[in-house]
């Protein structure tokens, strides 16, 4: 993982991109002791090259590390958290908070030097294993999510199997009258 981080950081550096261009990382396994694994992650982080540390952001996952876990780590090492909605649905935390309140906690991990807060958005493919991404967006589900976050300033990355076509679909869902490329993703 460290070699991969070094490689990808070098690419961003060679492209002369500032530190708002980020490297997204899951924490990893728990190896029988989650708190020990968290402490190892924090220890290793402190020994990374400074340019990697400036670009690194951590994400909640759907197996081991809840949003609460990654926010704890974030607080210890002062790096941003990227929220993944599907992972949060599968492995939830903060049961008393709604989506907006949860994202306010995530937003606190982002500093001006990090750029705009980023989130991952995906939907469950109901015909596949838990955590598998959907091929297309379900319009109602997507609109409900967007309604709940409408007052937040952030970038949303879509994790949908149709990739760029899903971005066109999202524009069509959000702006049906203004968006003229609707047939591109439908064909």
Q: PLM ranges: what are they?
A:
Residues 79, 91-187:
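Histidine-acidic metal/acid-base catalytic patches
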Residues 72-74, 81-93:
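Long, repeat-rich segments with strong aromatic
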Residues 56, 84, 156:
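Conserved, mostly hydrophobic/aromatic
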Residues 1-3, 58-68, 89-103, 165:
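Active-site glycine- and acidic-residue-rich loops that bind
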Residues 27-31, 60-64, 85-89, 123-125, ...:
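Active-site-proximal loop/turn and secondary-structure-junction residues that shape catalytic pockets
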Residues 1-76, 80:
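Active-site acidic/histidine proton-transfer and metal-coordination neighborhood
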């Amino acid at each position: 993982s460290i070699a991969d981080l070094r490689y990808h950081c070098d690419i961003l550096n060679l492209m002369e991109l500032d530190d708002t261009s980020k490297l997204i990382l899951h924490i990893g396994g728990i190896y029988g002791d989650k708190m020990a694994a968290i402490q190892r992650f924090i220890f290793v982080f402190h020994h990374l090259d400074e340019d990697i540390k400036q670009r690194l952001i951590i994400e909640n996952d759907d197996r081991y590390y809840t949003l609460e876990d990654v926010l704890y780590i974030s607080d210890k090492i002062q790096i941003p958290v990227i929220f993944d909605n599907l992972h949060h649905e599968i492995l939830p935390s903060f049961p008393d908070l709604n989506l907006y309140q949860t994202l306010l906690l995530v937003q606190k991990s982002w500093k001006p030097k990090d750029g705009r807060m980023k989130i991952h958005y995906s939907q469950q493919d109901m015909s596949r294993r838990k955590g598998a991404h959907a091929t297309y967006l379900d319009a109602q589900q997507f609109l409900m999510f967007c309604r709940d976050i409408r007052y937040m300033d952030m970038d949303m990355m879509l994790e949908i199997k149709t990739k760029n076509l899903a971005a066109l679909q999202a524009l069509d869902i959000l702006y049906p009258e203004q968006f003229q490329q609707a047939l591109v993703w439908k064909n």
